[in-house]
Amino acid sequence: MSVRYPLLNRELGILGFNERVLAQAADPQVPLLERLRFICITSSNLDEFFEVRMAGLQEQIRDNPGALTPDGMSLQHAYDLVVERAQRLVHRQYTMLHETVLPALEQEGIYFHAADTWNDEQLEWARRYFLDELLPVLTPIGLDPAHPFPRVLNKSLNFVVELEGRDAFGRQAVMGIVQAPRALPRVVRMPQALSGFEHGFVLLSTFMQRFVGELFPQLVVKSCNQFRITRNSELFVDEDEITNLRVALQGELPARHLGNAVRLEVSADTPAHIVRRLLEESLLDEKDCYRVAGSVNLVRLMQIPDLVDRPDLKFAPFTASIPPVIANAPAMFDAIDDGDILLHHPYESFQPVLELLQQAAKDPSVVAIKQTIYRTGTDSPLMDALMAAARNGKEVTVVVELLARFDEETNINWASQLEAVGAHVVYGVVGHKCHAKMMLIVRRVVESGKATLRRYVHLGTGNYHPRTARLYTDFGLMTADQKICEDVHHVFQQLTGIGGELTLHELWQSPFTLHPRIIESIRAEIDNARAGKRARVVAKMNALLEPTVIAALYEASQAGVKVDLIVRGVCALKPGVPGLSENITVRSIVGRFLEHHRIYYFHADGAEEVYLSSADWMDRNLFRRVEVAFPIRERKLKRRVIAEGLSVCLGDNQSAWLMQSDGHYRRRRAGKTLRNAQLGLLAKFCS
């Protein structure tokens, strides 16, 4: 299929998503400490955006300046538009923090003490803290021919100090650099008796700016300003040269902190000549400098909601439910034997997934366990269960994706621990990240008086990560359906062995059948619409970028297919364009939880085909990753997925944003009845 249809810019779409996240911080219906958290989440998202997307744009401009972006802009023009919008977003973020959120926190007894507000007792406490806890760890670097400008680590907190006078060796002091080690706390609690507030805090940068002169004795400090450099964090691994992926990665990881600079953040009051020097040392242009009114890293404030015991200023706690079929069963295998089980996280607990693996590790009837791991965290009971299974003599095989961005080191550590207890560890297929979420358990059972091997499978849309399972919306399926189990077995064969493509009967798998099946399903809806039948596509995902899928959706709209897309993040498709996409709607749900499940619905002339998947409709997921989409066949479970995963989002009029044909979003206006997808599901499932 030739792609001749218009697309929207990816980078601008990512910034648009972060604008929607930041809008949560402005919503008075969101608890105050959660509003602060949304500001911090925006900062964290922007860090990754610059480390990956902006770094990639800069590289493309250097390597191929005449090239065009997929949406048809010159690279430089696209870069300039993205920088302009990013600057506006950062300005809005800091304005919201200082003019709205921090004053509201102060009214609630949560206060950040600036140095110019300290009384004598507070000043003495701060001085002692600096001298006792901070000074021994800090290393000042004076800049002169013998001390060149240091290589600043990625996203580290640094201070540039303008000096006057001569040092002990008679050298004229001009400038110094102080790097704040990551071991130092970024936020320090002031004793309540001194603070006068129930929760008083002092930022590390406040200590530094007030007492930095202690690091440069007998010199005059003319100015002290914080700065932060963001670097290209993509890892380069030559797939043709490596013989051991883990060893190659271990050699590359330290270099991540020293990649090419892509962004400079400085406090707004930094003198112009200092900014010029920092830009020169970083090989950056003026447009790459972000002057901020306050701390250069708002992510450091993410810990405040956890440090402040004010439940009234946070989202209400909830207890995820356990389905009765699991709660009433003697063991997980008995529950699955009774029929397929659908889990909807975070509303339903992730604990049954852990219990399935933990019971398998101890069950003498279990002979083998196979598992994929993409992200699981540094302290994972799931990994503990896999290691326990290996120690108990089970045949344990784990496909660990070492190239899961920013989790490489964690996954390398888990791979080493698994190998140490005798598990088989493989790293998937070089060149194709393993993003599929699969667990396969093989158990010896007696059926009709005869011993046989029975397979059990868990498939999911999200990671095997107990912490994010309480923060992200995802579906998981537990089944003993032997066709699905056989397909999962074949996928593991491909990941761990070498051989030709195996035929799958139930699963769609990238990079082989997933993309063709999606296109075929859309084309079937087009054919039905042209035949005068009802036709509909509803899809939910994190991102929609793949051009041929977008082209198929445009053609579907022109044929009269009703297309509803629920895309949380970036979407390159233009909805609502007359003659092109007037039958397509795109909405984004942004709320308490991160919308994460991927759902594909096709009306299929009334048969209603529903697939769950780990894959977004992006080039990388469809062609450069190992992904699976799995069908929901059981009628009751299918109705649940449609109702809980799709219909509630389409009906949401509180947390939904509707995409306009120019790529901008507007909030959906609430009707007479307020409907919030996430709150409704919390009320349905949780106590």
Curated annotation (Swiss-Prot):
GO terms for cellular component: polyphosphate kinase complex. It is an enzyme of class 2 (transferase). The active site is at 435 (phosphohistidine intermediate). It comes from the Bacteria. An intermediate of this reaction is the autophosphorylated ppk in which a phosphate is covalently linked to a histidine residue through a N-P bond. GO terms for molecular function: ATP binding; metal ion binding; polyphosphate kinase activity. Coiled coil: none annotated. It catalyses: [phosphate](n) + ATP = [phosphate](n+1) + ADP. It holds the Pfam family PP_kinase. Mg(2+) binds at residues 375, 405. HAMAP family: Polyphosphate_kinase. Belongs to the polyphosphate kinase 1 (PPK1) family. Catalyzes the reversible transfer of the terminal phosphate of ATP to form a long-chain polyphosphate (polyP). This is Polyphosphate kinase. It comes from Burkholderia ambifaria (strain MC40-6). The gene is ppk.
